[in-house]
Design a protein with these regions (language model features):
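Conserved ATP-driven motor cores of ASCE-family P-loop NTPases powering translocation/secretion/packaging/pilus
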Residues: 420-522
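General secondary-structure edge motif
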Residues: 94-98, 120, 132, 136-137, ...
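A broad, low-specificity signal for short, low-complexity segments enriched in glycine/proline
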Residues: 96-105, 114-115, 119-130, 150-151, ...
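A short glycine-/small-residue-rich loop at the edge of a beta-strand within enzyme catalytic domains
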Residues: 105-107, 371, 407, 463
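Short alpha-helical interface patches
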Residues: 45-49, 63-115, 211-221, 268-272, ...
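Basic- and hydrophobic-enriched, low-structure N-terminal and domain-boundary segments
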Residues: 1-146, 150-155, 489-490, 583-584
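Short linear interaction motif-like sites in intrinsically disordered regions of transcription factors
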Residues: 16, 25, 59, 99, ...
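P-loop NTPase motor domains
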Residues: 134-428, 443, 503, 511-535, ...
Length: 585
């Protein structure tokens, strides 16, 4: 019924145009009518009148004839639409079909070559979302060796058309593109967890604007340092640990000088918070520190959080302290102490100038330090949203693009699906790079479909994971095809017959998805037909000669703060604001 109404509305001008000739015929026939005429004599008279069609006469019968003709005309239209069936010839079992790469590129590519996002060799999308009303959130799926870095990540970085935060396994992209960024006037920062001696510094304390940010950071820290697959039926331990960490962090934020606000100091405070199982009344140096603060400020938020922790008995409190210390064990490493003691990242300036931050992580199973990158991303989102909403009252002046290579290796903040749905209005875009759909399901058990749904571009580069093949096949949909069946019987009265019918078929079956040519990629853009195109040839990039892939020297990073032995002998015992710990030890 809805289709019929839509069809009538679209054809209404045509039906209305025929009203004039209908009235003309009625007037012409009314002029031929005389009382006592049979239908045959009337038709003969009407036939003669048509030889002089503009000889019209108004008679007493003219209004009646006009009414009858219009009534018959309306009845004919009604009969036409009520007799229609809801048919879609050729689409009975599905309407999926392949689109044209050329037409899509013409629709989505910006005339300014530097203001696009590269999808494939012949398909690019403008960074101006108002032009095509699509967001610039992308999901890239491809197995090992499918070219996720070479055919998508690198070419887009080489455009140098935004600020970037890049997850860079092995540091491959930094070496290849770092010099190009410097030539383009970028501020370049590196957070290197493979070789911290070549890393710039990142201190989480520098991006805490309000007390609530402390709890967000601790929540991300605990989740990032909890082994995958580990489950606790009792949330008591994590909540108690959160209260302890929050108390220490809030104490440093409100009471300690800036140079002492770092994760190493928190670990030092925990080491001085020992509890005795047999003596619940024992007071550690840390207890005395908070007792002194309570005497001055009884309602201090750090004191209140510490009281929550101290509700645990001696044995339980000791277990909480041990658990908290184990999570912070990485900060006993001198090189980690150095790169987290101060801050060079300037996350808040990413949306105000061209800046690139490369987070270099191991591509092996060693993810022991990756929690630091997770914390950095959590605070980057907070800082970028603050700058967009409070400072610029809307969108950031410089677009910021988050390039999540090996997305599964770094845990993002809780509620990332909500962030993904709101970042576009702030001129923030993200590219999630996965090996298969299973990785996304493991990370976001309840929200994985929403994360894919929020991204208007989906690129599949090939792979060998079965559930991904099935998912891509379902995304592509079904088409309607013609089938032919034949039968033959032999013998004296043998016969042969053929039947033609239609049936539905996947545009690509899971097996065909698996066998996708390694040089091709499948691209799905919201509201468009899927297309297959060649992967981008990095050697044809206009800036290739300025990168390591094009023969230029590799970029070698020198940290802003030179790594010296003196940096490792930080005299924690001389911290003025917490020297009371030493006095009570």
């Amino acid at each position: 019924m809805r289709n019929q109404k839509k069809s009538f509305r679209s054809a209404a001008p045509v039906w209305a145009a025929f009203v004039v000739p209908i009235i003309w015929l009625a007037v012409l026939m009314a002029g031929c009518y005389e009382p006592g005429m049979t239908i045959f004599t009337l038709m003969d008279a009407f036939s003669a009148a048509t030889k002089n069609p503009f000889s019209l006469h108004w008679t007493t019968y003219t209004p009646k004839f006009i009414g009858i003709f219009l009534l018959l005309y309306g009845g004919a239209i009604l009969f036409y639409y009520t007799g229609q069936k809801n048919t879609r010839p050729g689409e009975e079992h599905g309407s999926a079909s392949w689109g044209s790469v050329r037409e899509l590129d013409k629709k989505y590519r910006d005339k300014d070559a530097g203001k696009n996002v590269i999808l494939t060799q012949h398909l690019q999308m403008s960074m101006n979302g108002k032009m095509h009303r699509r967001n610039l959130l992308q999901i890239i799926v491809g197995g090992s060796g499918s070219g996720k870095t070479r055919f998508l990540a690198k070419p887009n970085l080489m455009l140098a058309n935004a600020s970037f935060i890049v997850t860079d396994p092995k540091g491959e992209m930094l070496r290849a593109i770092g010099n190009l960024f410097l030539e383009e006037g970028y501020v370049l920062r590196v957070f290197d967890l493979i070789d911290p001696s070549k890393s710039d510094c990142y201190n989480p304390f520098c991006y805490i604007r309000k007390d609530a940010d402390v709890f967000k950071l601790i929540d991300n820290f605990i989740k990032n340092t909890t082994p995958k697959g580990a489950k606790s039926n009792d949330p008591f331990w994590e909540k108690s640990e959160t209260a302890l960490d929050a108390a220490l962090m809030l104490y440093l934020l409100h009471e300690a000088p800036v140079e002492d606000q770092n994760m190493e100091t928190i670990l030092y405070m925990i080491e001085n918070g020992g509890a005795k199982e047999e003596d619940d009344d024992y007071q550690s140096p840390l207890d005395l520190l908070f007792e002194a603060l309570e005497e001055e400020q009884p309602d201090h938020i750090a004191v209140r959080q510490y009281h929550i922790f101290k509700q645990a008995a001696g044995k339980t409190a000791k277990s909480i302290l041990v658990s908290a210390a184990v999570r912070l064990a990485s900060f006993t490493l001198p090189e980690i102490q150095r790169i987290t003691a101060s801050d060079d990242m300037e996350l808040g300036k990413l949306g105000e100038r061209k800046q690139a931050i490369f987070c270099i992580i191991p591509d092996s199973n060693d993810a022991s330090l990756n929690f630091l990158v997770g914390m950095l991303y959590t605070q980057a989102f907070q800082e970028l949203y603050y700058q967009a909403d409070k400072v610029h009252q809307g969108a950031l002046p410089v677009p910021v693009r988050l390039m999540f290579d090996e997305f599964a290796n770094v845990a993002l903040p809780d509620g990332y699906a909500r962030l993904q749905a709101t970042m576009r209005s702030r001129n923030i875009m993200s590219t999630i790079i996965l090996q298969n759909i299973s990785q996304l399901k493991a990370l976001f058990k309840d929200d994985w479909e929403g994360i894919i749904g929020n991204a208007d571009s989906f690129v599949y580069l090939g792979g060998n994971e079965q559930s991904t093949h099935k998912y891509i096949s379902e995304l592509l949909g079904k088409e309607t095809i013609d089938t032919r069946t034949s039968s033959q019987s032999k013998g004296r009265n043998g016969s042969f017959s053929q039947n033609f019918q239609q049936t539905g078929r996947e545009l690509m079956t899971p097996d065909e998805v698996r066998r996708l040519d390694n040089k091709n990629a499948i691209v799905l853009i919201r509201g468009e037909k899927p297309v297959i195109d060649e992967k981008y040839d990095i050697l044809k990039h206009p800036n290739i000669h300025r990168t390591e892939d094009g023969g230029a020297p590799p970029y070698l990073h020198t940290p802003l703060r030179a790594f010296a032995a003196d940096d490792l002998s930080f005299p924690i015992e001389n911290i003025d604001d917490i020297e009371i710990l030493e006095e009570f030890t």
